[in-house]
């Protein structure tokens, strides 16, 4: 393989931050009472009540941070988009044919988009610039992203906007997610989020409430793709207790590349999260995913797969890393489809129950088939 990426400095996890009140009328809320009905507002308090209510003064307005080149080898060309590459003067390189996808169409795509806009919901499909957006939305499916559109981390591979949410929580969001899932008639629902290190519970309370609101309105299978909650076991347990059918947490890359690819995460911490889900005894499938093309070596990928199996992972996705903008990590290699098929075979041999491996595979792509909700090729509704 090509030369691997340079090592970076390991950054410590973000400590919880108390947000400053926004300029306004100075109205103060009772922290013990939680957010007012229909306010959609909350802020981090010094201590989190058992039910996970944040409650306190009005929060500052969430602040989006600019994307700036953060990684050695990243270009600053005018172009941006899937497949951008520092080796090109414009920040792009030509994509191989197997990575080319058709543009979004109409019909179900337009209906899905209209529904999400009406209910003021974000999707990881849009925020992370997923290449499968057109395919999934035309099937009437989408992966809903909760807890806002600003992430408190700056991972080297991710297109989701970094920013300072300043403790903002939309308390009405769980209800709207429940309505969207019911209206779309989903049989398999995928919920994910940005990382919210500014919240004392990492956003786990909202995850639990979203699961509860979906349960009230639908008998859909619920899959959640969660952050690491900075290793806080009680926050993860809150999600486990809400009983989704699948908990997914992506390892993303091999151990050696974590300091560059996921500077605010830890390889061992992600493995521990998967182990905690498995050892909880809850009837929950454990899922993870890894990207190829960042400079990893074959033996490193194999060791990562072994580590995942050893920590209880049952479902696995393997996909190609595609550079979102010239400010993100460059693609070291475009892995061929036959190599992905080989990795899928290796993963099955190691003991994974179900594996999706291909250049365009993403965490929630055909998640229903991977989890066994429907048979491969059967027309389904998954989001």
Language model: regions and residue ranges:
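Local cysteine-cluster metal-coordination motifs and their immediate loop/turn environment
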Residues: 124-136, 147-162
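Conserved functional loop/turn residues at catalytic and ligand-binding sites
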Residues: 150, 154, 159, 185, ...
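A secondary-structure boundary/capping signal
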Residues: 126, 146-147, 192, 225, ...
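Short connector loops/turns at beta-strand edges and beta->alpha or beta->beta junctions
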Residues: 149-152, 186, 252-254, 321-323
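Auxiliary Fe-S-binding modules of radical SAM enzymes
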Residues: 1-3, 29-30, 34, 38-143, ...
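Core AdoMet radical
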Residues: 159-176, 181-274, 287, 291, ...
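Glycine-biased, low-complexity coil/linker segments
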Residues: 8-10
